[in-house]
Amino acid sequence: MEFNFIINKLVQLDQQGLGVYIPRASRSKVSSQQEQQLGQVLNTMGERSAIAQGLKQVITNYDKVQGTDQRVYIVAEGRTCQGFLKVGQKNLFYRDMMGNIKEIKPLCVLDFYVHESCQRQGYGKLLFEYMIQCEQTSPEKLAYDRPSPKLIAFLKKHYNLVKYIAQNNNFVVFDQYFRSDASSQNKQNQNTRSYSQPYSDYSSQIPTNYPQQQQQQSNSKSYPYKQENNIDLMQHSSSRNNKEFLNAGRAILSKEEIYKKDNLSQQNIENTLNNINNSQYSTKSQQQQQYQKDYQLDKYENNWGADKNIKKPPFPGQDRQLDKIQQKIQQTERELDVVNQQIIKQRQNLSQDPLTQNHRAQNVYNTNQFGTSPWAQTGFNYYSTSSSNYGNHYTYYKK
């Protein structure tokens, strides 16, 4: 963004064109004309930043910066201002994943803008690194006020900052903020030694002619399990040179104890074998082996089909199939029993119905009075009925 005046006269810049504007410190040193020019720079850049971020209100303004501890970092060259970055401390209430609220006071990035004509040329990273160096902090120790998608992508690309928990105050605090606190405390608690001289210089100070007896005494005092009384030597028979190994203070077993352990181990083996033989799985495997010996499947499969009278022997697993078939048969029998019971209940209900009782009584009366019709036993296929005072009259017809 170009202006009609030189920005170097308003803010002290270094060789790379980087500088910082601190309102409290620089207000007394700046004239009224320079204040107007600074206000013009901050107002125009703040408006462009709000338009680029799609904000309804302008965040950065010359009047808003005055009377605060905020700092505005600027990158400029001559009459052009490439971008700015505004920071300041804020008291924030942070809610974690468990719902716990913490009060923190981090340094916050309040506004960050690089002109469209200067983007993707390294000005943003240069300005951000300059701010970190001046504030003596790191990117994960910062809080970001309403960061735009471009700023989030910038932090992910250059500083690997991705994970954060959304807050009601629209500030973004990355998870590394709290991890860095824990790591810094751990570093302070650790008792580390730093030697300015190389290791070779220290090794030259160690005495070479150290008495051997004193070394043994010191080892026995500091490490009691290395004393001579508690050390047992045993020769390794498989080693070529008959090397001697330390038993680490353990007493060597006698022959009787070794025999006892061997007997116990043999008893345990016998018990396990008996358990295996008595188990149901072992019996099934034995049955399969006996089946292979008795029926000789290879010979049987070769002769199968030559003599149809030979019955196919039972194969392994046939018992399971028979069990399944029996279960299905039992299930169908149960279903038939249920159906029969339902039929019996329906018959009982019909017998108790008054309509069916009247119908049966009328039929009994007709048969007793007139007798059965001889035509019913003939080859007539259908008939018609007509009622009268004497009962039902049947008229039979042929096809």
Swiss-Prot record:
GO MF annotations, alphabetized: tubulin N-acetyltransferase activity
Region of interest: Disordered: 183-223
SUPFAM superfamilies found in the cross-reference section: Acyl-CoA N-acyltransferases (Nat)
Domain of life: Eukaryota
Recorded catalytic activity of this chain's protein: L-lysyl-[alpha-tubulin] + acetyl-CoA = N(6)-acetyl-L-lysyl-[alpha-tubulin] + CoA + H(+)
Comp. bias intervals (Low complexity): 194-223
BP GO annotations: regulation of microtubule cytoskeleton organization
GO cellular component terms, semicolon-separated: microtubule
InterPro entries reported in the protein's UniProt record: Acyl_CoA_acyltransferase, Atat, GNAT_ATAT
Positions of the N-acetyltransferase domain: 1-178
Cysteines joined through disulfide linkages: none
Annotated site location: Crucial for catalytic activity: 53
Enzyme's top EC category: transferase
Keywords, comma-separated and alphabetical: Acyltransferase, Transferase
Family membership noted in the UniProt record: Belongs to the acetyltransferase ATAT1 family.
Function: Specifically acetylates 'Lys-40' in alpha-tubulin on the lumenal side of microtubules. Promotes microtubule destabilization and accelerates microtubule dynamics; this activity may be independent of acetylation activity. Acetylates alpha-tubulin with a slow enzymatic rate, due to a catalytic site that is not optimized for acetyl transfer. Enters the microtubule through each end and diffuses quickly throughout the lumen of microtubules.
Protein name: Alpha-tubulin N-acetyltransferase
Organism: Tetrahymena thermophila (strain SB210)
Taxonomic path: Eukaryota, Sar, Alveolata, Ciliophora, Intramacronucleata
